[in-house]
Amino acid sequence: MSLPEHDVTIDATDLRCPEPLMLVRNKLMDLQAGQILKVIATDPSTTRDFRDFCRFLNHRLLHSEQSEAVYSYWIEKG
């Protein structure tokens, strides 16, 4: 599977909850509907946090993956 194209990347490595979520929330406010944000994080709680965040705020979690202790997410702004 090819990874989704993205418009902006946020590096949230070494940040702990709630910092990654706040960075994503703030950056999505700057994007237009349909634009895609890639997030790189190391906090395992982001797996749950980003899934729930997208569901509640009508964004789409297009793809997520984990490699070692690094989590990557592609979020489309709703």
Question: Which ranges hold each PLM region?
Answer:
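Right-handed parallel beta-helix/beta-solenoid
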Residues: 2-11
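Generic serine detector
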Residues: 2, 45, 64-67, 72
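Intrinsic-disorder/low-complexity, polar/charged segments enriched in Ser/Thr/Lys/Arg/Asp/Glu/Gln
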Residues: 7, 34-38, 70-72
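A broad "ordered helical/assembly scaffold" signature
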Residues: 1, 22-26, 70
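Amphipathic, hydrophobic secondary-structure cores in small proteins
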Residues: 12-65
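Core SAM-dependent methyltransferase catalytic element
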Residues: 72-78
